[in-house]
């Protein structure tokens, strides 16, 4: 009896090991088919005019819209757009990035996948990091600990120190927010690089990442005094003169700060350019918040990287109505709103 291989279901199935990955994504055709089902599982959406429905198969990789005859590929408008790197290499990078508990550096990815240059590996990882932050993601709620901590990194853009021939160490201040679960444990986290610990920096961070009415626990810093006026239940823990050490009373933020520092030193050998630190912090948040997931976030990541840039699509839709419809401004706006609602419903069903 012949063994039948069941095709993976996009957005649901996950290759548990490298052999599974090779069975599923061993060819470019398999990768294209997977991404097409993931992006257009409920029907083709033209990236130019936004028309919904079936499309012509113009070639192996191109689909043509029946309405405007625009040809596009499944990678149009995504992080794969116009890439010369094969899709199977991209998906292999995504699998390796998410399958490793501590992640992977650009040098490690270059070595494992046999990439031609370090820059290619770095660019791939940086594009994945951009996709790890979902616009409009949910804010933290419940009891949330907030504090700041310094992160030590090696700035390779600075001259090498004559003492020990080492790169100069730079300390970057970051804000940390950690959900505290009852009776114990931590929930989701948020991280952000901030220039200083003044109210102008920490209060906007709290407003961006924490729901109003949530309980926010901080140290005795005066920078957080306005939180009660902004609708938060503010609990101040004064460290000065307290018998309880800070790493006990604010265990969540201290634990996360230590994990971030260990991750930077272990995976990236402490070598991160300060200008790109926010992207690395986004990756750590993505990993930490999916630490209990069996797929370590690959399913979420592949969904996001295959999703088109909706803002660009909407702009093209509006231009298309103005240029070819012959409608006046009011009619264009009505048609645009109708098409936008239909597009949003289709994308919501697909993701």
Each model region followed by its residue ranges:
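Residue-level recognition of single "structural anchor" positions
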Residues: 1-351
């Amino acid at each position: 009896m012949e063994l039948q291989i069941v095709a993976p279901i996009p957005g649901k199935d996950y290759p548990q090991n490298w052999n599974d990955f090779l069975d599923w994504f061993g060819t470019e055709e398999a990768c294209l088919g997977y991404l097409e089902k993931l992006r257009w599982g409920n029907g083709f959406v033209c990236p130019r005019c936004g028309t919904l429905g079936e499309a012509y198969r113009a070639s192996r990789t191109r689909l043509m819209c029946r309405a405007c005859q625009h040809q596009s590929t499944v990678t149009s408008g995504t992080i794969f757009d116009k890439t010369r790197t094969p899709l199977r290499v991209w998906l292999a990078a995504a699998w390796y990035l998410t399958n490793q508990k501590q992640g992977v550096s650009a040098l490690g990815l270059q070595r494992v996948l046999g990439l031609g240059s370090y820059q290619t590996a770095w660019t791939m990882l940086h594009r994945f990091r951009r996709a790890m932050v979902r616009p409009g993601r949910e804010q933290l709620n419940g009891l949330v600990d907030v504090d700041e901590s310094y992160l030590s990194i090696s700035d390779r853009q600075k001259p090498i120190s004559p003492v020990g021939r080492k790169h100069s160490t730079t300390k970057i201040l970051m804000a940390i927010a950690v959900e505290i679960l009852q009776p114990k444990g931590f929930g989701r986290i948020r991280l952000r690089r901030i220039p200083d610990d003044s109210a102008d920096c920490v209060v906007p961070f709290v407003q961006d990442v924490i729901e109003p009415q949530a309980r926010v626990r901080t140290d005795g810093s005066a920078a957080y005094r306005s939180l009660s006026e902004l609708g938060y239940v503010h609990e101040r823990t004064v460290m000065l003169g307290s018998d309880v050490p800070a790493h006990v009373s604010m265990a969540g933020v201290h634990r996360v700060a230590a994990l971030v520092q260990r991750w930077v030193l272990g995976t990236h050998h402490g070598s991160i350019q300060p200008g790109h630190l926010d992207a690395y912090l986004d990756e750590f948040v993505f990993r930490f918040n999916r630490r209990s997931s069996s797929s370590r976030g690959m399913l979420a990541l592949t969904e996001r990287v295959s999703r088109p840039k909706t803002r660009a699509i909407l702009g093209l839709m509006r231009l298309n109505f103005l240029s070819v419809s012959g409608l006046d401004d009011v009619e264009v706006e009505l048609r645009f709103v109708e098409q936008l609602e239909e597009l949003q419903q289709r994308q919501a069903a697909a993701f």
